[in-house]
Amino acid sequence: MPTREWNWSHAEKQTARRAFDRALDEEKEAAIRELKERVARIRSAEDIDDLWALEDWLRRRRKGIDDKFDYRYSVLPEVFARLLFEGAIEEADLSGLAREKVDEIRRIAGIYRDLASRRG
């Protein structure tokens, strides 16, 4: 859910796109590495259940990536907060965004940290 409507300058859009694309590329590369590892464990037709499990994993992984990486400007602060919390981006990746946007991203990332610490 968007926290508020932001106006994004051309320079901010470029900064946001670079940070977003870099994190997305890293996520896709990690998924491909894991896929190759899982495929390598399937040795024969006797492992057919592993093949169907791979299909299920791939479907869930794609949904997870699609859900996490939403490039609508209305939700980018939440997206960046999650990526910051997960370590997929650093605050330096956001330099070029207006201070109030970075502050909002930090605030939301703090909420993620608080929730994670409560879960243990």
Task: Please place each PLM-identified region on the residue numbering.
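Acidic, Ser/Pro/Thr-rich low-complexity regulatory regions
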Residues: M1-G120
